[in-house]
A protein has these predicted regions:
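Short, Lys/Arg-enriched alpha-helical recognition elements, typified by the DNA-recognition helix
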Residues: 1-106, 110-158, 170-173, 188-189, ...
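Residues in the helix-turn-helix
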Residues: 25, 99, 142, 167, ...
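Short, basic (Lys/Arg/His-rich) helix/loop patches that form interaction surfaces
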Residues: 91-93, 136, 194-204, 213, ...
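Short, polar N-cap/turn motifs at the start of nucleic acid-interacting alpha helices
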Residues: 95-97, 227-234, 336, 355-375
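Catalytic-site neighborhood detector that most strongly recognizes the C-terminal catalytic loop/helix
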Residues: 106-108, 175, 241-243, 364-390
Length: 404
């Protein structure tokens, strides 16, 4: 009776989540805890009511609630730390020099990075950085993540006989608005491909492979040459690479069972990989003994045949790819989309080509076809309208020829 929500959360993570769930899932869930703790963490389980959760969900969707917004350095902070003093500050904060250079140049940064710099400088955060996204609120989908986590925690508590029932069962989850899916149209893809010769070779190839296959970022970073049969033109998705705070880079199984899949490659993708394989072999010879010969993948030490690596063969950090991509787009005056938008672009091309939605779902690794239809409903309607027009033209020809 005396256990609080905070105490239950700690118990749930230690005894259920960490032993049974994927590290990435646990990490994602832990990011939700601060808001939950602030809102209902102090409440005893015996006193928790649906109304507490309803109030929490309402708060989540209020303007200004986002903690992951963009932060810019203030003029007073820049004045306090002229160029001669910045290097020591950046080192003390543990911030990468490239990241710091972008911050001093006026680019926005994350709350985490901004806090590290302010703390290292011993300056009040509000004096060092300003939130440039104060009016942003959590999307319905983001707010629903809190409902899913709490529901899972309370279901477990019921099984453990710590609660009589799950209060989430009596609360409607936050509404999810239909989000606009960001993607590149054919012209946008053509412009991106034309700019890629200016990109680092590995990033150029990974962007093209994302467009050709629709694979997720972590799936691409986790690829090995043993996953690819170039003569047959197929690629197998067998693992994903993720960056876990406090643990570093970890290989794990794909997102869902359906995410483990085999994707047929077209001639362009096959040739791209053949050329890239030769480039990588030349790089390995150039690096020589500094090349990392083995890597640990899901508890096993194996020969290093990773497709995408750092200069010395170590696994590439997916987060680095994510931060590089928008900068590259800005430098080449390209539409400001996310790296994940390449996956959406692949789906849009398939749907426009009238590929069956079941095939699209299979290539993307969606657990259910409904996931595909929900995400790409707009694309499907547009494609269906074009199909109806084509059918109408066909019948018009038939009727005209029949009348003739």
């Amino acid at each position: 009776d005396s256990m609080t929500v905070d105490e239950l959360l700690a118990k749930w993570f230690k005894e259920y989540a960490e032993p049974q769930l994927k590290p990435q899932t646990v990490s994602d869930y832990k990011r939700l805890v601060p808001r939950i703790s602030a809102a209902v963490g102090h409440i005893k389980l015996s006193k928790l009511r649906p109304g507490h959760l309803m109030q929490f969900y309402t708060q989540l969707q209020q303007p200004g609630v986002r903690m992951d917004g963009k932060y810019k350095v203030t003029a007073s902070f820049i004045k306090k730390f002229p160029k001669g003093k910045r290097k020591a500050l950046v080192a003390a904060a543990g911030v990468a020099e490239r990241t710091a250079a972008r911050i001093w140049a006026g680019e926005s940064t994350s709350l985490h990075t901004a806090k590290k710099l302010a703390e290292a400088a011993n300056v009040a955060f509000s004096k060092a950085f300003v939130n440039t996204s104060k009016d942003e609120k959590l999307s319905g989908n983001s707010a629903r993540h809190y409902h899913r986590l709490l529901s899972s925690v309370f279901n477990t508590a019921v099984r453990w006989q710590l609660m009589a029932e799950n209060p989430c069962a009596r609360v409607d989850p936050p509404k999810v608005e239909a989000a606009d899916v960001q993607y590149l149209d054919e012209q946008g893809i053509a412009r991106l491909l034309a700019a890629l010769p200016d990109a680092p070779t590995q990033y150029s190839v990974i962007v093209q492979l994302a467009l050709f296959t629709g694979c997720r970022r972590g799936e691409l970073c986790g690829l090995r040459w043993s996953d690819i049969d170039l003569p047959a033109g197929v690629l197998a998705v067998n693992r994903t690479l993720t960056s876990i705070p406090g643990q570093g880079l970890l290989f794990s199984t794909p997102k869902t069972k359906k995410s483990r899949r085999v994707i047929k490659l077209d001639e362009n993708a096959v040739q791209l990989l053949k050329d890239y394989q030769q480039w990588q072999l030349r790089e390995r010879l150039r690096i020589g003994s500094k090349w990392v010969r083995t890597v640990e993948i899901m508890g096993k030490t194996v020969d290093n045949d990773l497709l995408f690596t750092k200069w010395d063969g170590r696994p590439i950090d997916p987060a680095g790819l994510t931060s590089w991509f928008p900068r590259f787009l800005r430098q080449h005056d390209l539409p400001p989309v996310r790296f994940h938008s390449l996956r959406h672009s692949n789906a849009a091309l398939l749907i426009a080509a009238h590929v069956p939605v079941t095939t699209v779902a299979g290539r993307l690794g969606h657990a259910q076809v409904s996931t595909t239809t929900n995400i790409y409903a707009g694309f499907i309607r547009s494609s269906d309208a074009k199909a109806a027009d084509a059918l109408g033209e066909a019948f018009s020809r038939i009727l005209h020829e029949g009348a003739g």
